[in-house]
Amino acid sequence: MALTGYASPAWTGQHDASIRQSQGHLALAVGRIKGVLPLLHTPAWALHGDLHGDLVTQKAVLAEAIQLPHSTKVLDLGPRAHAGLKPPKSWTEVRRHTRQVPLPSEGDVHLPKTRDKQARRFVREGGLVAVESGHENMAWSHVERLHAASRDRKGLSSHQRRLTPLLQRLAAEPWTFAVTSTNAEGEVVASGGFVLLPCGTCVYAFGGQERSKDSGRASVAMLGEAMRAAQRMGANTFDFGGSQDSGVDKFYAEFGGVPVAMWRWVKAPFWFKWMFPKTWSAWTEPSRVLDMGA
């Protein structure tokens, strides 16, 4: 049977270290901190990954990752991690979150009233929203461009050298699709790349927008159309991918996205937090959203 979702070889990169067992999968990559310290980590595209199965299965997959020789590890377990999982002693456990909305099995996908008005206004003013799948690399080129631009604005690395070939491979897969929003002037101002997982979840994996007067409404229209496309393809849950940015998280919440816990396990030498305080802080900053019940 062909591997789909995050278990697919389409995700494999030059430094891929993913663990694949018959009952489970954990996406991993190998890198270096400051070009020196070896790092085993969950790739940025798989923070809301595909760890699944019962407790015994998940323990077996994680045990294999834990035993790998890297002194520094950052493992993101995703929203389907079993509640009974516990990190090894000396590891740091961090609670983060994504947001999800259920999709109806039939009938229309309804957006909250304010979001629906914004999407309709974008189209009424000449905007066009298109869903493309298969070998439509033009749509995915917009996903790449706007994803990188959005991360650059936030001061985050876009990993362009690895992102470009990755999106080219994903564009050819039947379990992915891209959505673009084009304004009345013919400019693509918002786009997203989406991944359908075997569990029935559709993940907003890549995306971004231009800074313009209509980019906000364009993004709303793009996500609304993505939710409808996911429903047509058999998805029962739409996952916004999670964001630690409070503004972005609020944007997802206004779509009706409900917070779902995701756990991160971090292992590092005892001196790491003093040598690399900013990196340690970024890795271990917890989500407060679940505490607030937002």
Locate predicted features.
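A gly/proline- and charged-residue-enriched helix-loop-helix capping module
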Residues: 44-84
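Short phosphate-engaging motifs
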Residues: 57, 139, 247-248
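Active-site/acyl-donor-binding loops of N-acyltransferases
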Residues: 33-36, 83-108, 232-294
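Conserved acyl-donor/pantetheine-binding loop and adjacent beta-alpha core of acyl/acetyltransferases
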Residues: 34-44
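Aromatic (often tryptophan-rich) hydrophobic motifs at membrane interfaces
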Residues: 61-64, 165-167, 173-277
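A conserved beta-strand-loop-helix scaffold within acyl/acetyltransferase catalytic domains
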Residues: 1-36, 79-101, 106-214
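Glycine-rich loops and low-complexity Gly/Arg-rich segments
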Residues: 53-54, 99-101, 124-125, 155-158, ...
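Short, high-confidence coil segments that cap the C-terminus of an alpha-helix
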Residues: 15-17, 68-72, 176, 232-235
